[in-house]
A protein has these predicted regions:
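Amphipathic alpha-helical/coiled-coil segments positioned at domain termini
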Residues: 1-41
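Charge-dense polyanion-binding interfaces
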Residues: 30-66, 193
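Non-catalytic C-terminal interaction segments of nucleic acid-processing enzymes
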Residues: 60-161, 179, 193, 197, ...
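Inter-domain linker/hinge segments that demarcate the starts of reverse transcriptase
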Residues: 185-199
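Conserved RecA-like helicase motor-core motifs
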Residues: 201-203
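Phosphate-end processing signature that detects enzymes handling 5′-triphosphorylated RNA
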Residues: 217-221
Length: 352
């Protein structure tokens, strides 16, 4: 929680951690103004009287420096830059607290630090635009992000009756029920609607793209999208906390994204290429990280929308990321909320 959203936390920084950075930045900024006023003497040439050893020592500790900082190390830095160093130290400490055998926690911490995992937390809750989560959805999504127990106890999964854990790992892998399909369809529709609004004339779930079968490699087909070729965007969501990906995800951020991307490529890329179609897997992790190719395509869609509507490109792309992030976490919450483990009821036999 003490690390910013961009590093996998909730952005609830501790004032005691960042106070030295705020004070040092303020003093140094004021000294620069004094220097401009008085001229001549360079008040920041020396360290004495500018920042005391107590301040420099506290800031050094907050940033995790092995040797005490000097004023010369800080001149020209903004408070934001100093605070980022504090945040990075907090992130390192968090990783160091994880034991050697805690593979799941390592994988989670790496996953939540990927780009865009916290977009839903930074999105204003605008109900009119569908950019909001209900309280129950927000609680489930937050617990899952922080690695807290999502359920009160383990027990049989109500969807498939297999044993479920308290953290929601089984729930995210459970193939029974329609929540995973609904999550996929909502993400697909967001990309499709954006392509429509951008005037790209997309086709949803286009049939008979490949000769000899009715496979649908394109959740969204966009004409003339890649070097004059039609592009088949195929959306999938993968959890890094499954048996197939957890060991790699505990070592490398985005391992599950690569795993799912390669599976998609091996499944349809060659057949699409033969038909002159560019096959583009759009892969996301349950925590909200996206494969580099997916990020490129979402950014490209945002740019196309901005050109067609006259919006600012950065703003249009940011709104698209917000929408995708909210939809992903809403889908996760539906999966978790419908898989609260069953517990056997109390057996009353009348015997005292």
């Amino acid at each position: 929680g003490k690390v910013p959203v961009s590093m996998g936390g909730l952005g609830l920084r501790a004032a005691e951690d960042h106070a030295p950075a705020a004070y040092a930045a303020s003093v140094l900024s004021a000294q620069l103004q004094v220097q401009d006023l008085v001229g001549g003497r360079q008040v920041l040439d020396g360290e004495e009287g500018v920042l005391g050893p107590e301040v420099l020592g506290a800031l050094s500790v907050a940033q995790g420096e092995q040797e005490q900082l000097r004023v010369a190390d800080l001149v020209g830095m903004t408070q934001r830059q100093m605070s980022v160093r504090v945040d990075l130290h907090q992130q390192r400490r968090l990783m160091e607290m994880v034991g050697e055998g805690e593979e799941r926690e390592k994988a989670r911490l790496l996953a939540v630090a990927l780009d865009h995992t916290g977009d839903w937390l930074n999105t204003p809750p605008l109900k009119a635009l569908g950019l909001h989560l209900r309280s129950s959805e927000f609680i489930l999504a937050t617990k899952y992000r922080l690695g807290m127990p999502v359920f009160d106890s383990a027990g049989p999964c109500p969807a498939c009756l297999h044993q479920s854990d308290v953290f929601g790992d089984h729930a995210m892998c459970c193939r029974s029920g329609g929540e995973r399909i609904s999550r996929h369809n909502n993400l697909r529709d967001a990309l499709f609607d954006t392509a429509v609004a951008a005037g790209l004339g997309p086709v949803k779930e286009g049939r008979f793209l490949l000769p000899g079968n009715d496979r649908r490699p394109a959740d969204v087909l966009i004409r003339n999208w890649v070097g004059g070729k039609d592009a088949a965007l195929d959306i999938t969501v993968v959890t890094p906390l499954q048996d197939n990906t957890m060991p790699g995800a505990a070592q490398t951020a985005g391992h599950a994204l690569t795993y799912a991307y390669e599976r998609k490529i091996n499944g349809a890329e060659e057949e699409c290429r033969r038909q002159g179609i560019a096959f583009l897997p759009i892969v996301a992790e349950t925590f909200g990280g996206w494969h580099p190719d997916a990020k490129r395509e979402v950014k490209k869609l945002g740019a196309a929308l901005a050109r067609h509507t006259g919006q600012d490109e950065t703003e249009a792309t940011s709104h698209l990321w917000s929408r995708m992030s909210i939809l992903l976490q809403r889908g996760n919450a539906a999966i978790l909320g419908n898989r609260i483990p069953n517990q056997p009821g109390a057996h009353i036999d009348g015997i005292i």
